[in-house]
């Protein structure tokens, strides 16, 4: 059960980070409202707070989170940007998820 909670938390964290970066991107590149920076900032604060909820060393969390971030970014590419991922995008994201699983769930000495 801890594994599902960890993965779920990583997924929510990745969405918070991507939203926090995507909204300023819209402002800078597409001339959208400067007011997008407010929810972007709040999303990045949420992102940092969510990372703090993991009960393991920060470096391990950041390393493992990167694998989930890659997976969510590929989903974002497809669902938000409307660009279908290539086979290699999918393979790469699965390799990253496998790496995350090794980092987070490998047996460790007590």
From Swiss-Prot:
SUPFAM superfamilies: Multidrug resistance efflux transporter EmrE
One GO CC annotation: plasma membrane
Cell membrane listed as a keyword: yes
UniProt-annotated location(s): Cell inner membrane
InterPro entries assigned: UPF0060
Keywords for the protein's UniProt record, in alphabetical order: Cell inner membrane, Cell membrane, Membrane, Transmembrane, Transmembrane helix
Domain of life: Bacteria
Principal cellular location given in the protein's record: membrane
Membrane topology, as annotated: Multi-pass membrane protein
Bilayer-spanning residue ranges: 7-27, 33-53, 63-83, 87-107
HAMAP family per record: UPF0060 (MF_00010)
The family this protein is said to belong to: Belongs to the UPF0060 family.
The protein's name: UPF0060 membrane protein ASA_2267
Species of the source: Aeromonas salmonicida (strain A449)
